[in-house]
Amino acid sequence: MLFVGEDPESTVVWGALDHDLNLDIPGFPRSDKVADIKWNRNKNKIARIKKDMPLHNEMDKYDMFTNGTLKIKTLMRNDSGLYEVEIYDSNGVNLLSKKFDLKIQGKSLTPKFLHLKTGAI
């Protein structure tokens, strides 16, 4: 079943409110061919690693590792959305593109306790 606004080519990823999340890239090409890794959120650039250039982050909210993994720090509800990674070689040829639809799970505001009477089981 597809919901309005969902991308059929994206992988749904769940993150926990107030926790960090790593978006790992399945099928990441582990070779010297990788020259440029770009991450976008809802079509806006958020992080980029280009060979022989320092890491570029749009915000302190994100870290990116050399294997392309994007770390999102301290998830908030407004961090949900479509994240896309694009990996290119030195000739600008696209080696891999992946999309992730991030959903945020909130914490329960009230603790739940179960009280069993003696002999109830």
Model region roles, listed by residue range:
Residues 3, 106-112:
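Proline-centered linker/hinge motifs at extracellular inter-domain junctions
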Residues 82-108:
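Extracellular/luminal immunoglobulin-like beta-sandwich modules
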